[in-house]
Each structure stands twice: as C-alpha cells, then as structure tokens.
Amino acid sequence: MRRRLSARHGFECHSFGYRTTGRAMSEIITQLTHFVDRIDAEEVHFVGHSLGGLVLYRYFETAPCAKPGRVVFLGSPTVKSRTAERVGRLPVFSSLIGRMVHDELVWPQDPRAWRCPRELGLIAGTRPLGLGRFFPRFDEDCDGTIGVSETKLPGHTAHVTLPVSHMGMLASAAVADQVGEFLSHGRFRSL
C-alpha cells in the first residue's frame, strides 16, 4: 500500500507500528501523537487498517493533529466486531487478544460517531476469507473477518465496498487507488 500510494499518488508515507497486547489505548495514542509531531509536512493524512482505524478514531477524539488532511479506515470494525467478540469468549484466545482489543472490539463502552472535522472515508471488503468464516456466521457481505455493517461509522464522509478480504485489502491495487482518490479529493471513485 505504501509503495502504491507513493508511486501512483505522490504521497510520502510513514508507518506507525504498535502492539495490541499489554498496551492500553492511551499509551498507543501518546506514542502516535509523538510520531505525528515529528512528521515535517504541511498536510498529514491518516490511513488505518482494522484496529488501526480505531486507534485513529481514539487519536482524533483526544489529541487531534493540527495539520490539515483526511482519514481513511480500511476494514475497521467501528461499531463492534462479531469475530473479536466470539474469539474473546474462548478461554484459549481471550488472553491472547489483549486488553485494548477486548475494550475496543469485544465490549466497547460508548457508541461511536465521527465528530472530527476531517473528512473520513471507509472501505469495507466483500471477499469472505478469514477468521470470520470459522467463528461468527455473517448474514451480510463481509471481508472474512468484519461485516460491512460493522465498518459504518456515523458521521463518515464516504463509504465504499470492494471485492477484497480483510488482509487482502492491504495488497490490493484497487484499494490503494481508492485510498489515494479519497486522500486527494475527499471522495471515492465511482465503481
């Protein structure tokens, strides 16, 4: 994705990494704030995949970047995650998913809505390959891990579905092009 956004759309990309086990969301937000503060650019866009979208949601709730830009979530379960809920109830997995995943996906405490002035684009996949095939039964289109309805955050600017799996969206040229389109123009290209 980084390579495609750079080569096809001219973006300078920076990757922020974090661990979901043993870390509280507040720690990750503090680290992200320091990371963003070191970026020397007039405009800063954000792209988060899966739980990364929720990290960005919490970041913009508490410490929004002062520089202008747009935000895209890729396959982020903004409402709740049936897969995480089901996996989190199994004793063998509950200790592996980490506190942050549990708090944000299994038992979120607050109804989420995008209240940030930045434009937010949401991309959901419809190719059902992933954990969701084994744990929850989806009665809707899904990317194999997250249902399309789980990606819809009230207050978003635009939402698009693409025929990709949850992990496959990271390597998809079509997803990268839609991300580039939204970051550049605040809308997705019509399919």
Please annotate each region the language model reported.
Residues 117-191:
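C-terminal catalytic-base region of ester-bond hydrolases, centering on the histidine
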Residues 5-6, 12-16, 23-119, 138:
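Serine-dependent carboxylesterase/thioesterase catalytic core
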Residues 6-7, 153:
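Anion (oxyanion) recognition and catalysis
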Residues 1:
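The serine-hydrolase catalytic nucleophile loop
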